[in-house]
Amino acid sequence: FDGRNAAPSDKASDLISLAVRGCCSHPACSGNNPYFCGGKR
């Protein structure tokens, strides 16, 4: 079970981290999501 569940969740977290990185490069988006972007202003 663990081996089968690892791949989809890894793909999902990769997509999420890519989306978050894109968001954090935009001041308006990173300002609205400080917890995603390290909480830095």
Curated annotation (Swiss-Prot):
Impact reported for residue 33 to A: Loss of inhibitory potency on alpha-3-beta-2/CHRNA3-CHRNB2 nAChR (Lt1.3-II)
Q: Where is this region: Ser-Xaa-Pro motif, crucial for potent interaction with nAChR?
A: 25-27
> Any remaining note in the record?
Lt1.3-II (C1-C3; C2-C4): this synthetic toxin shows no or very weak inhibition on alpha-2-beta-2/CHRNA2-CHRNB2, alpha-2-beta-4/CHRNA2-CHRNB4, alpha-3-beta-4/CHRNA3-CHRNB4, alpha-4-beta-2/CHRNA4-CHRNB2, alpha-4-beta-4/CHRNA4-CHRNB4, alpha-7/CHRNA7, alpha-9-alpha-10/CHRNA9-CHRNA10, and GABAB-Rec-coupled Cav2.2/CACNA1B.
Protein name per the record: Alpha-conotoxin Lt1.3 b
Q: What keywords is this UniProt entry annotated with?
A: Acetylcholine receptor inhibiting toxin, Amidation, Calcium channel impairing toxin, Disulfide bond, Ion channel impairing toxin, Neurotoxin, Postsynaptic neurotoxin, Secreted, Toxin, Voltage-gated calcium channel impairing toxin
**In UniProt terms, what is the effect of altering residue 34 to A?**
Loss of inhibitory potency on alpha-3-beta-2/CHRNA3-CHRNB2 nAChR (Lt1.3-II)
Outcome when changing residue 35 to A: Important decrease of inhibitory potency on alpha-3-beta-2/CHRNA3-CHRNB2 nAChR (Lt1.3-II)
Q: Which organism is it from?
A: Conus litteratus (Lettered cone)
Do you know which InterPro entries this protein is assigned to? Answer: Conotoxin_a-typ
Question: So which residues are the signal peptide here?
Answer: none
Tissue expression notes: Expressed by the venom duct.
Q: Which comment does the entry carry about domains?
A: The cysteine framework is I (CC-C-C). Alpha4/7 pattern.
One term under GO cellular component? host cell postsynaptic membrane
Organism classification: Eukaryota, Metazoa, Spiralia, Lophotrochozoa, Mollusca
> What intrachain disulfides are recorded?
23-29, 23-37, 24-29, 24-37
* Post-translational modification Cysteine amide, affected residues: 37
User: Pro-peptide positions?
Assistant: 1-21, 38-41
MF (Gene Ontology): acetylcholine receptor inhibitor activity; calcium channel regulator activity; toxin activity
Report the subcellular localization. Secreted
Question: Function of this protein?
Answer: Lt1.3-II (C1-C3; C2-C4): Alpha-conotoxins act on postsynaptic membranes, they bind to the nicotinic acetylcholine receptors (nAChR) and thus inhibit them. This toxin potently and selectively inhibits alpha-3-beta-2/CHRNA3-CHRNB2 (IC(50)=44.8 nM) nAChRs. Lt1.3-I (C1-C4; C2-C3): This isomer inhibits GABABRec-coupled Cav2.2/CACNA1B but has no activity on nAChRs.
